[in-house]
Each structure stands twice: as structure tokens, then as C-alpha cells.
Amino acid sequence: MNEAIIQLDHIDITFRQKKRVIEAVKDVTVHINQGDIYGIVGYSGAGKSTLVRVINLLQAPTNGKITVDGDVTFDQGKVQLSANALRQKRRDIGMIFQHFNLMAQKTAKENVAFALRHSSLSKTEKEHKVIELLELVGLSERADNYPAQLSGGQKQRVAIARALANDPKILISDEATSALDPKTTKQILALLQELNRKLGLTIVMITHEMQIVKDICNRVAVMQNGVLIEEGSVLDIFSNPKEALTQEFITTATGIDEALEKINQQDIVKHLPANALLAQLKYAGTSTDEPLLNSIYRQFEVTANILYGNIEILDHIPVGDMIVVLEGQAENILAAEKALHEAGVDVSILKRGA
């Protein structure tokens, strides 16, 4: 089992503005393992960005303990490292943002080289390093282009290369794909996954989009009003969300709410027969495809009319939703429901026939 490379224990962050006290983060504990792609999700103002800024102490907490790669960096209300040791620690932590923060008057390779200005490498070694980094992010042919000549996705690739210049062990992505179109977002996420695999990079993803968490992360924390309300593997959170906000994020990512609106307009649902019901089937790692639905027909003479189906592969395990009309004798439908539950399927009755 991987060890935690980031340990945030009982973190409080309080700001004082004139007569107001703002509790931005309240007693949050998060442990992130080496090699994780860890998502922190929440709406604007949830405290996500404020929390992760304590990892490299760009933001000092009010209370709590921070341990990064085995070193206690903050405890008992104060920084535990010397100024030099803190600078060194920060080099182990790269950051990318929604806004690329590239220098307009410098080329792509010059922007990356700027991150190496305090490096002990020789001039030749720095030049080779920059070439390697641009190759790593798939941008070597754009090395001499200025930011104005690059697309949004290409600018973010330069920013990623720059963030990796000092060989960090941790990369923090603060809404790094928010300004990108969906296609470019997928390409950047694929690049981050590749860097995670190739370099063993631990990535902390701050986002308000559960779709991004679903696409790239293996663990996720959900924040609301400065509080961590739910945390776990992406598989567990998607298959069994406990908090209302988490459920809201997941329905947005899966599109189930939009599907239900359309389904409710269909004649078959508007005029549901007395011996039928509309049900949502949720499952993780269980087959709810044709064989299982066929088996409830064979055993109980209950037919299943599939109106909607969505399946995702999370951590190599199928997780999905189906909306079906189950039709048959009342006692047979009850028996079919029980059989589905026993097969690991969560059955929610949305409407009963009149």
C-alpha cells in the first residue's frame, strides 16, 4: 500500500476582515497517497483552493499540522522549516492554474527555462532539460512560438512543462481546464494521466466539475462551506454518494436528471399501466445488462423496458444507471425487486402505475 505523501490534519484557515471573521476552512483532514490523482471538488467559495495552498504553505493555516513527503512543514501554529528548506520543499510541488500565467514576450522554451533560473544545472543541461520537457508535453515543435501564437491547450502544456521543470513529486492543478473547450480538456486530462503513470507524479486536482473527477481521479473529497463533507475512492463516491451535494454533483456528471425530464414526457411513462412501475437501477460491478433482465423475465415473468442506460468504467469496474419500466403481476415485481437487490443492484421506484 502506498504511503501518504501529503497529510493535512485538522486544518483551520480563518481570515479577519475589519469586523468580520471568515472561516474559509474548518477542521479538514486529508491524506493523499503517493501516486494518487486526488480530486477536491466543490462549488466556488467551498474552500478548495485555500486548502491546497497550505500544501506548499503559500497559505499558512490558522491551526493544524501539515506533513509533506515525510517532513512536518507546519505544526503548533508555525512553520517548521527554515526559509531555505521551505524553498527546497516548494520546488517539489508544481502548480498549474486556470490562467496560464505565461510571459508574453518569451517563447515557449524561454517560459519553461525561466523556471530553471535558480537550478544548479549548466546552461547546456538547462537547454536539454527544456527540450525534454516540451517533448514530454507534446509541444517540441512549438518551442520557438510565443504565447500569442499558441492555442489555449498549447499554453496549458507550456505551463505544465514549466511546473515540471524542477522534477516535482507533487503537481497541484487549480481549475487548470476551466478555460478550455471540452476536446482540449480531455487532451490535457489524458496528458496528466500519462505524467502520473510515467513519472509517478502525485496530482491534486481542484475542480467544480465531477466529470473531471470521474475521468481522471482515483480518490475524491467533496467540500462545502469550508468543510470536507465526503471523501473516498471515486468508485465508492459515484456508486454510493451519501451527501446531498455529492449526489447533485454526480447527477450533473452522469446526465441522469436531464434523461429523467425527457423520460417523464414519454407516453409510456405518462400513462403507466396499473401493473407497471418506473424504476432506477444503480449498480457497481454488477451485470444489469440483458442476461440479468432476461433472468427476471424467465423467473418472474416481469418484463423490463429500458428507457435509459449509462455505464462508466471507474477503477476498472462498471458503474451505471438504468431507467426501466418493469411490468408484471404485483407479487412478481416484488420478487424481481428482491432478486435485483440480492444481485447488488440498488432499485429506486420513481413512479407506480395508476
UniProtKB/Swiss-Prot annotation:
PROSITE patterns: ABC_TRANSPORTER_1, ABC_TRANSPORTER_2, METN
Residue ranges annotated for the ABC transporter domain, each copy included: 8-250
Main localisation: membrane
Gene Ontology molecular function terms on file: ABC-type D-methionine transporter activity; ATP binding; ATP hydrolysis activity
UniProt binding sites for ATP: G42, Y43, S44, G45, A46, G47, K48, S49
Entry membrane topology: Peripheral membrane protein
Alphabetized UniProt keyword annotations: Amino-acid transport, ATP-binding, Cell membrane, Membrane, Nucleotide-binding, Translocase, Transport
Subcellular location: Cell membrane
Family: Belongs to the ABC transporter superfamily. Methionine importer (TC 3.A.1.24) family.
Quaternary structure, from the entry: The complex is composed of two ATP-binding proteins (MetN), two transmembrane proteins (MetI) and a solute-binding protein (MetQ).
General function of this protein: Part of the ABC transporter complex MetNIQ involved in methionine import. Responsible for energy coupling to the transport system.
Protein name: Methionine import ATP-binding protein MetN
Organism: Streptococcus pyogenes serotype M12 (strain MGAS2096)
